[in-house]
Amino acid sequence: MYGCKYPSFTQLINTFIAYLGLLTFSNSTWANTAGVFPPVVQEGHRSLQYRVTLNPDTGAFGTRLHYQESLNDDVMLRGIVHASESATGHSKVDFVQAELFWDLDEDTDRLRHGFRFDARARGRGEPSSVSVNYALQYSVSPQWQARLAVLNTRSFGDKANTDIQFQARSQLSYRASQAVSLNLEYYSQLGAIDNFNPWKNQKHQIGPSVNWRVANGWTLYGGFLSSMNNSSPDTVYRMWVTKAF
């Protein structure tokens, strides 16, 4: 309609492979690669996703690769690998993580909710963790959608802080067209669930993002987050590439 030319399938493949290569060249001080996960599970869903984030102040990259597949219309499994390279050039895998999504509602419900259970394993004596997380999603209209996620994480191991750590994330999304959605996202890390940190020690980030459903199962995501206090990077740029099968 506006003379825009979609990238070819070959161009998307090459772009995806190029981003994939960053997985082994990421700075260890990685930025926020998290998302506001939905409670929705779609039967027959399978996808591969690569995420890259950049803190322009330090040049630090965060990278993550995951594969997910639904078992039915209620349960989905996801596997994640996160790798990095230190300032001295030492490459390592930071962690691997397994996730189970449990959708508690029907596809026709406007109000959806569900759980996500996480198990994260780290090497080199670093603490591993488990999480029990809850997500809520409400479709206000065919165009507008609101989402909230709360995460409760407990670490274990010799160096672990055994307090249950609390996070909250939210997203307001507007579907501008069949291909494009515009979002406003918020992320916070508040501290121990029974004793929140003071504001100056909490982490709060907010910013816009856009989802572009391109073609042939490809989706591109781009956006940035800005800090609401001095405990997070001033700005973090984020890009995700997803291929559904």
What feature does the model see in each segment?
Residues M1-Q11:
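N-terminal secretory signal peptides that target proteins for export/translocation
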Residues Y6, T15, F117:
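Alpha-helical and His/Cys-centered functional microenvironments
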Residues F25-S26:
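N-terminal signal peptide c-region/cleavage motif recognized by signal peptidases
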Residues Q11-L22:
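Sec-dependent signal peptide recognition
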Residues W30-F245:
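Transmembrane beta-barrel domains of Gram-negative outer membranes and organellar outer membranes
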Residues A18-Y19, T29-A31:
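Cleavable N-terminal signal peptides
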